[in-house]
From Swiss-Prot:
SUPFAM superfamilies: CCHHC domain. Zn(2+) 3 binds at residues 724, 729, 742, 748. A zinc finger (CCHHC-type) spans 359-402, 403-446, 715-758, 759-802, 807-850, 860-903. Zn(2+) 2 binds at residues 412, 417, 430, 436. It comes from Homo sapiens. This is Suppression of tumorigenicity 18 protein. Belongs to the MYT1 family.
């Protein structure tokens, strides 16, 4: 068999409508058990190692091309329809079972000499199974089997080895049929196979198997698609005049009555029937055709119906492939990278919380990931506790590849833990169960509810009863197979999945010091979510919740929850108890709460008055809405498919985690504008009525869990719950670590965030009243809480002491309230700062004189009626304490800035007036000064004209000087050239007259050169004289010597 046979699934080449295949699958699986599967199961049981047959949902081979297979399927059907139309004879199916492996093919070729009587028995059984197809059409049950998470937290399915060992194909080969004794039972391909090797059939059918709950050697044949995708059937070819030889059909009535005993020899034998000649086969086939004609017609009709169903599935596969091709490629790469980086704890790790005596899971490699680091120099001091890059001294040398590789490894191994609420509040350094609040919660649950595990009154999970019926149904459908007892299977599953509810209210009371709330069974609320919106981001969600109990559904499939739901809901409930302590999970109360939102709760979170003052008061009267119904409109009755988990304090199902991740991410800012349900204080103030109403509200058919009623004292009911006054704060992250003792904004991490958000909304009202002050440098450090001049550095520097003016003194609001008092004689001595009757001598005098008839004094009446702020025009709003009766100074008044500005303007006007009155006294002096100014201006003009003339003369002289300087330069250059020529001539003359000596003179030289020249000039100038012949000869010789000199 070539490589293409491994990638193709079963097909049929007839026409018709779809028919259920459950009965056919069951009979064929009983008839043809896989010897190879038996051999592998025996080996695995001998070794004692569980076989990991799960494969990722997204792993598929590189040759994944459903379009080509779909086209090939259509072409095969077109070619096969031709002989059916041309031949008028009724055709019978020739069956040959093709193994999926080359080893099985070789076994089939060796066993090609099987006996004819056994072949006829097989043919008889095949026809009988096809006849009963119509009877089981209404009995096909669509069941869903949930899967546990694989190593990376994504749903795992069956591996392709099951498909290769348990699938068979049927075809014809020129009238000769070959039967293999090791034919595997027919099974449907799961979702993993439709993504990997059976992708050309378009994700047609799926079967999710649970390794823990599957009985040994009992194959399950279920459909998980709500669209009723049909299973693929053996491929059958029909030919014109050739029919199947069915010898000894009438002689095998005992085998017809007991097909299982009849199949014992074919399954265990090693020989294959040898066939007679072609002529004998044709004659016997004609005989069988006349007897079994009607049965074959029914079988052919049923197979034609199956062919149409498979054709529809092939077309659907093409559409699914085009839609999810890119998504599968991306998720495949992400999954491969994640599996290389981390090893997530699976169901084996979860048993640690179920059974305290279970062995600890295998530790991960506790080596520092940085190359060349042996653990020395770390912050922890020991590298077995150092499994990340943080705290390593060699962190600077880490290449980018290692940083990217260990980016997602640093997760908390606790299922459902996102790193929040740890002891060190950093999940990057939290890689173990120590310090994890969810792990502590589950350990506390085991110790508290140990007695409830053994109690027979514990309510059974609906899925356990469902599994019991499922095991019984499998036992009824396969009577000849040896399976384990239903009680043993259910008890084993109860160990793995049946967890006892955990009281998180008592956990809050012990760990966080919180007074426990009412322990009642809350009403169920499952928010409806469309099936198409289940986990829209399957890449981001597993990183957020590494091992959460939510199922990642394949696209286009309906979501359902089955066997592992109780275990998953337990982890989700534990995660919800911790996540409720986070400031970013306030929507969880909306999901879990079964009371609708009241009108007053919308504005109860943040109250800001018209001047922008934040009311952080603890003593507020909250009106309870007693007529609020207990359940909302979307309350759903629990079903085995949804399987919500009910605890004694809260109710959490998988939809809660879905809503928590879809509504708001961890990194998004808190939205205080959302409306919330009733707070814990409102729930606590009316506990008795809620207890009675919740007991009366019961759902039909619901398994009730007894919850004891706590005895609540009257003073505990009336006592107000002391919570943090910051809106949106649940007490986590305070400096004290316990919000029960935290009754103010100091030490709250959300106080600054809340005030900044309010400041952004009410920036004008919350500004510092000092002009030019932006709030920086205050004593409090935050101008959002600084609305007065106290603590402002600019107010101290630029502030001016107020001196009351006459108008302010005459203002009646600034006077003493006692009638007739002008402020004199007060204790303070200044009536401007005395605005009450205390310290007034007239007040004391009149109080003595007034008869004690119960009537109050006039100033007391005025004070009660008009207790205004002493600043004019201020009604007391906007002060720091928001109570102007206790406000007896200007500090904290927002209108004080206007008074300061007014004081500054009055001082400027005063200085101007002083300059005006103390300066010039008369107009004459002003006129005299004006005349002097005019004279000075005229003299200035004259001087300026003279200056202009002088400037022109200076410029002309400067130009002349420049020209003279240039001429001097030229003369100097000429002189230098002449001196050079003179020097040259003197040297030439000295050299030429060196031999001639004048009388009475020595030989010519530089020292006597001038004298020598003077004598020569005198001699030549007096040529008219009569010289002696000697002198004449001397002159001639001198002339001859001088001829060589050129001037």
């Amino acid at each position: 068999m070539d490589a293409e046979a491994e990638d193709k699934t079963l097909r049929t080449r007839s026409k018709g409508t779809e028919v259920p295949m459950d009965s056919l699958i069951q009979e064929l699986s009983v008839a043809y058990d896989c010897s190879m599967a038996k051999k592998r199961t025996a080996e695995d049981q001998a070794l004692g190692v569980p076989v990991n047959k799960r494969k990722s949902l997204l792993m598929k081979p590189r040759h994944y091309s459903p379009k080509a297979d779909c086209q090939e399927d259509r072409s095969d059907r077109t070619e096969d329809d031709g002989p059916l139309e041309t031949h008028g004879h009724s055709t019978a199916e020739e069956i040959m079972i093709k193994p999926m492996d080359e080893s099985l093919l070789s076994t089939a070729q060796e066993n090609s000499s099987r006996k004819e009587d056994r072949y006829s028995c097989y043919q008889e059984l095949m026809v009988k199974s096809l006849m009963h197809l119509g009877k089981f059409e209404k009995n096909v049950s669509v069941q869903t089997v949930s899967e546990n998470l694989n190593d990376s937290g994504i749903q795992s399915l069956k591996a392709e080895s099951d498909e290769a060992d348990e699938c068979f194909l049927i075809h014809s080969d020129d009238g000769r049929d070959k039967i293999d004794d090791s034919q595997p039972p027919f099974c449907s391909s799961d979702d993993n196979e439709s993504n990997s090797e059976s992708a050309e059939n378009g994700w047609d059918s799926g079967s999710n198997f649970s390794e823990e709950t599957k009985p040994p050697r009992v194959p399950k044949y279920v459909l998980t698609d709500h669209k009723k995708d049909l299973l693929e059937v053996p491929e059958i070819k029909t030919e014109g005049d050739k029919f199947i030889p069915c010898e000894n059909r009438c002689d095998s009535e005992t085998e017809r009555k007991d097909p299982q005993n009849a199949l014992a020899e074919p399954l265990d034998g090693n020989a294959q029937p040898s066939f007679p000649d072609v002529e004998e086969e044709d004659s016997e086939s004609l005989a069988v055709m006349t007897e079994e004609g009607s049965d074959l017609e029914k079988a052919k009709g049923n197979l034609s119906l199956l062919e149409q169903a498979i054709a529809l599935q092939a077309e659907r596969g093409c559409v699914f492939h085009n839609t999810y091709k890119e998504l599968d490629r991306f998720l495949l790469e992400h999954l491969a990278g994640e599996r290389r980086q981390t090893k997530v704890i699976d169901m084996g790790g979860r048993q640690i919380f179920n059974n305290k005596h279970s062995p600890r899971p295998e530790k991960r490699e506790t080596k520092c990931p940085i190359p060349g680091c042996d653990g020395t120099g770390h912050v922890t001091g020991l590298y077995p506790h150092h499994r990340s890059l943080s705290g390593c001294p060699h962190k600077v040398r880490v290449p980018l590849e290692i940083l990217a590789m260990h980016e997602n490894v640093l997760k908390c191994p606790t299922p459902g833990c996102t790193g929040r609420g740890h002891v060190n509040s950093n999940r990057n350094t939290h890689r173990s169960l120590s310090g994890c609040p969810i792990a502590a919660a589950e350990k506390l649950a085991m110790s508290q509810d140990k007695n409830q595990l053994d109690s027979p009154q514990t309510g059974q999970c609906p899925d356990q009863a469902h599994r019991t019926s499922l095991v019984k149904q499998i036992e009824f459908n396969f009577p000849s197979q040896a399976i384990t007892s239903p009680r043993a299977t259910v008890s084993k599953e109860q160990e793995k999945f049946g967890k006892v509810p955990f009281d998180y209210a008592s956990f809050d009371a012990q760990v966080f010091g919180k007074r426990p709330l009412i322990q009642t069974v809350q009403g169920r609320k499952t928010p409806p979510f469309p099936e198409s919106k289940h986990f829209p981001n399957p890449v981001k969600f597993p990183n957020r919740l590494p091992s959460a109990g939510a199922h990642t559904q394949s696209p286009g499939r309906a979501s359902s929850y089955s066997y592992g739901q109780c275990s998953e809901d337990t982890h989700i409930a534990a995660a919800a108890a911790i996540l409720n302590l986070s400031t970013r999970c306030r929507e969880a109360t909306d999901i879990l709460s079964n009371k609708p939102q009241s009108l007053h709760a919308k504005g109860a979170e943040i109250e800001v008055d018209e001047n922008g003052t934040l009311d952080l008061s603890m003593k507020k009267n909250r009106i309870l809405d007693k007529s609020a119904p207990l359940t909302s409109s979307n309350t759903s009755i629990p079903t085995p498919s949804s399987s919500p988990f009910k605890t004694s304090s809260i109710l959490v199902n998988a939809a809660f985690y879905q809503a928590l991740c879809d509504q708001e991410g961890w990194d998004t800012p808190i939205n205080y504008s959302k409306t919330h349900g009733k707070t814990e204080e409102e729930k606590e103030k009316d506990p008795v009525s809620s207890l009675e109403n919740l007991e009366e509200k019961k759902f039909p058919g619901e398994a009730s869990i007894p919850s004891p009623k706590p005895k609540l004292h009257a003073r505990d009911l009336k006592k107000e719950l002391i919570t943090c006054p910051t809106p949106g704060c649940d007490g986590s992250g305070h400096v004290t670590g316990n919000y029960a003792s935290h009754r103010s904004v100091s030490g709250c991490p959300l106080a600054d965030k809340t005030l900044k958000s309010l400041m952004a909304a009410n920036s004008q009202e919350l500004k510092c009243p000092t002009p030019g002050c932006d709030g920086s440098g205050h004593v409090t450090g935050n101008y959002a809480s600084h609305r007065s001049l106290s603590g402002c550095p600019r107010a101290r520097k630029g502030g001016v002491k107020m001196t009351p003016t006459k108008e302010e003194k005459e203002d009646p609001e600034l006077k003493c309230p006692v009638i007739g008092c002008d402020g004199q004689g007060h204790i303070s001595g200044k009536y401007t700062s005395h605005r009450t009757a205390s310290g007034c001598p007239l007040a004391a005098k009149r109080q003595k004189e007034n008869p004690l008839n119960g009537a109050s004094l006039s100033w007391k009446l005025n004070k009660q009626e008009l207790p205004h702020c002493p600043l004019p025009g201020c009604n007391g709003l906007g002060h720091v304490n928001n109570v102007f009766v206790t406000h007896r100074s200007l500090s904290g008044c927002p209108l004080n800035a206007q008074v300061i500005k007014k004081g500054k303007v009055s001082e400027e006007l005063m200085t101007i007036k002083l300059k005006a009155t103390g300066g010039i006294e008369s107009d004459e002096e002003i006129r005299h000064l004006d005349e002097e100014i005019k004279e000075l201006n005229e003299s200035n003009l004259k001087i300026e004209a003279d200056m202009m003339k002088l400037q022109t003369q200076i410029t002309s002289m400067e130009s002349n000087l420049k020209t003279i300087e240039e001429e001097n330069k030229l003369i100097e250059q000429n002189n230098e050239s002449l001196l050079k020529e003179l020097a040259g001539l003197s040297q030439a003359l000295i050299s030429s007259l060196a031999d001639i000596q004048l009388p009475q003179m020595g030989p010519i030289s530089e020292q006597n050169f001038e004298a020598y020249v003077n004598t020569l000039t005198d001699m030549y100038s007096n040529l008219e004289r009569d010289y002696s012949p000697e002198c004449k000869a001397l002159l001639e010789s001198i002339k001859q010597a001088v001829k060589g000199i050129h001037v």
